Amino acid sequence: RKRGKQDVVREEIPTMEIPQYVVQPTPEMKDFHGFLNKWKVPAYGLMYDVKDARCVFPIYKKGRIIDAIGRSLKGKMPKWYRYTGQAPAYFAGSGKTLLIVEDVLSAIIAAQEIQDVTSMAILGTSLNAKHMEYIGEYSRVLVALDPDALNKTIQYRREIALWTGLPTIAICLEDDPKYRRTNDIETIKNKCLHSK
């Protein structure tokens, strides 16, 4: 072996096989488009689960779909469905500040409303080592879980600060970010600006 040559370790990325009943949406899928219009979410890249009437949010890693989360459009339970469970979180946006929220819609809408933020939906799970790997890639962290989870918000702030050493702030909101409440969006924006 030549001197200086290094072995290359390639990360194997699991790829999700998309079920046949998860399709590209068409204009005739009124429940799908009504859902997107209600939340003011763009349809780009989203799919539709015709079997269970779900809006499907794919999760990508290095250009490959590794998981997807489906949101029930007609009251089918569970409301949120994980297709593989391989992805620890859903990300939206591309800022250096990480905003941790609970669900996909809150992540998408926060990224739309707040510049220079990446939103991470933890998808109803507890924080784990995989989450911390992702969190460690950012310059600071804001935790803004649903209002009924204030204790969990404070707990996550402590865990993240201890685990990563990053500046981490807990934010108490009046409602989920997905509802676009002006006070909540302004609170998050102010915390982004003043925590630099």
Region locations from a protein language model:
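N-terminal cationic leader/targeting segments used for protein routing and processing
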Residues: 3-6, 80, 184, 190
